[in-house]
Amino acid sequence: MSSSDPKPGPKPGPWPPTPESAAMPPSSWAKKTGFRPKFSGETTATDSSSGQLSLPVRAKQQETQPDLEAGQTRLRPPPPVSAAVTNGETDKDKKEKPPPPPPGSVAVPVKDQPVKRRRDSDGVVGRSNGPDGANGSGDPVRRPGRIEETVEVLPQSMDDDLVARNLHMKYGLRDTPGLVPIGFYGLQHYLSMLGSLILVPLVIVPAMGGSHEEVANVVSTVLFVSGITTLLHTSFGSRLPLIQGPSFVFLAPALAIINSPEFQGLNGNNNFKHIMRELQGAIIIGSAFQAVLGYSGLMSLILRLVNPVVVAPTVAAVGLSFYSYGFPLVGKCLEIGVVQILLVIIFALYLRKISVLSHRIFLIYAVPLSLAITWAAAFLLTETGAYTYKGCDPNVPVSNVVSTHCRKYMTRMKYCRVDTSHALSSAPWFRFPYPLQWGVPLFNWKMAFVMCVVSVIASVDSVGSYHASSLLVASRPPTRGVVSRAIGLEGFTSVLAGLWGTGTGSTTLTENVHTIAVTKMGSRRVVELGACVLVIFSLVGKVGGFLASIPQVMVASLLCFMWAMFTALGLSNLRYSEAGSSRNIIIVGLSLFFSLSVPAYFQQYGISPNSNLSVPSYYQPYIVSSHGPFKSQYKGMNYVMNTLLSMSMVIAFIMAVILDNTVPGSKQERGVYVWSDSETATREPALAKDYELPFRVGRFFRWVKWVGI
């Protein structure tokens, strides 16, 4: 090199540190189940077994990152290498600097700079690409020497508001709107669930031979008990904004008990009271079993077997099992029933996006709007004489009609006219529902055993509703103890329903999840105010009389939609699992198929094609106890087995539980429910505020670990 050449400048320092990868949002399965794994790029590291937020810790960095959506494993980018020194460092700094490590793993410890502990994008401290440090040899490499940022935690109120905004909810679980919004949204919430509250008694009371006045009394009792049990559940149960009422889960066993052989020969005006007392006794025993299941902590063990793949076919089978009841009864008056079905479909589907003052009135009020329009049209047809035939009286029983001309039109007059019911005119203005109003309950062990099994199915249905609604309105899913506490309280409230004589148990209505998602209203106070209004309405006898006057054809038409909705809500639980997995598809398909095929075998066994049964065709699936294939020397056992195995929901539950818990599958594939744990409740005030008992009642039950937070 010549002397005229310029001297080379100082060598440039190492490359600047590469920016950390942007935080990846949780995968769809993680969002839907509340699962937060310790994978790279996710900002909230969790324990995969419990799904809870963990404190920032320094651990070894993983080399690969599982892809929850694609089920693949992809390589992590190499960790950043920070600058060792700057170009302007002094000789003193160079002397104090330790010798550099081998190429490819340069990292300089920083002693003079205070480094705050922070969580990496995956919550751990990494090492260079190799199992033992630098390409597989040497000691683990230190993190780059630069001033780290601390993890900022939002205040609790800001965190709650953020959750509510992310979920697009108008009001969260603990929000208290003004009095006017509470009243409006409370009325909206209960009107949207009108069908679920009143349709069950309109089915079972006529099946028991009850009069129009008795139908009105049972409807008022259902409103009263639903209001009381909802207040109890929002205060001492799960504390989620879930309405309690007569669940469709109890409808099939109630109809099976009503059509038992020992009740077929009853005559007189006391048929209704006698059958109701038998039904009350069975509900009380079955509900007491459910209460023991919850408060003893056994429900926490059952939760290990209950997953979305189990809940989906079980709940769906409840709605599908009533296919023989729906349209056969609608066919008694097609011009009224079909119009009712078409209107509710148009409102719920075709007009669902039409908003008035930011409220989707057609979607929210699909059932009451379609009922009001159809009822008004049927009233006009009745008043104009469309269903009036000369010399025929619709109030005369068919057995007393002599004229052949009138016999031909009696069915049409009975189901199409709207003035055949005198429930409204005969109902008193004030009536207080009281316990044991139908008499002392009668206890029969075989009917009680059937209800005990049904209470387990009702608990499974409620578990799915708890999880789905908590993801909408709460900061986290409840703990297993809270779920057990809620199931225990549902058993207690169903005992109250049995004492008051509603004909069914009082459990969480599955339609709650749909209503909360549509109305965007998750406030607990709204549901509580609506429950108080429901209790007040139940004391006005004319309200029960008005609801009891709904024609049977319209009831069947609404039930066609409600049972279809119930089936859809059950199948929607599959969104928490891998719905495209062949494992889950086969399990759900087998469960649904056999839930329809096996009961059909039991229901058709021993019935000749030419047999003339005394019960209507839509009640024939519930008389299987008298002719089922299970025959032994114990008549009570025959009744229990034939009745249970003729219920679709029981077969679906048995099939799904066995297959889901024996066929291998990952937690992600199965969509295992992720519940919060007690340790998280102590760290996060939001979780405790969401689920802790009011008035500091929980401090007296801290020793009961299995039913608390």
From Swiss-Prot:
Record bears the keyword Phosphoprotein: yes
InterPro entries reported for this sequence: NCS2
Protein name as catalogued: Nucleobase-ascorbate transporter 12
Species for this entry: Arabidopsis thaliana (Mouse-ear cress)
Residues with Phosphoserine modification: 40
A biological-process GO annotation: uracil import across plasma membrane
Keyword tags: Cell membrane, Membrane, Phosphoprotein, Transmembrane, Transmembrane helix, Transport
Regions that span the bilayer: 190-210, 218-238, 240-260, 283-303, 308-328, 329-349, 361-381, 438-458, 530-550, 551-571, 585-605, 639-659
